[in-house]
Design a protein with these regions (language model features):
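Generic signature of intrinsically disordered, low-complexity, basic-rich segments
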Residues: 11, 50, 65-67
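C-terminal structural segments of small proteins and small subunits
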Residues: 58, 62-81
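Phosphopantetheine-attachment site and its flanking helix in carrier
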Residues: 32-50, 69
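Thiotemplate assembly-line natural product biosynthesis machinery
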Residues: 1-23, 75-82
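Phosphopantetheine carrier-protein modules
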Residues: 15-35, 51-63
Length: 82
């Protein structure tokens, strides 16, 4: 899977969970997104693990503080191409 495919799928996931349109190049992080609370974070991780057919470690989950950070972690975790 290529990095842009990861970004596209994450954008779709964030759009569904945040209940608003999220742009692919939009910067989203926990500190600036009022709807990104602990429950949404759990939902996000479970959805990502299901959609990408992977399991993130506790350390990886703790580092998922933005859409870009999550994309980076997934890229490393599943061996994404550039």
């Amino acid at each position: 899977m290529k990095r842009n495919e990861i970004d596209l799928l994450l954008t779709q996931i964030f759009s569904v969970l945040l209940k608003r349109e999220v742009m692919t190049d939009e910067v989203i992080d926990r500190s600036s997104e009022p709807n990104w609370d602990s429950l949404l974070h759990l939902d996000l991780i479970m959805t990502v693990e299901s959609e990408f057919n992977t399991q993130l470690s506790v350390d990886e989950i703790e580092k998922c503080i933005s859409k870009d950070a999550l994309a980076e972690i997934l890229g490393e975790h599943i061996g994404a191409d550039a």
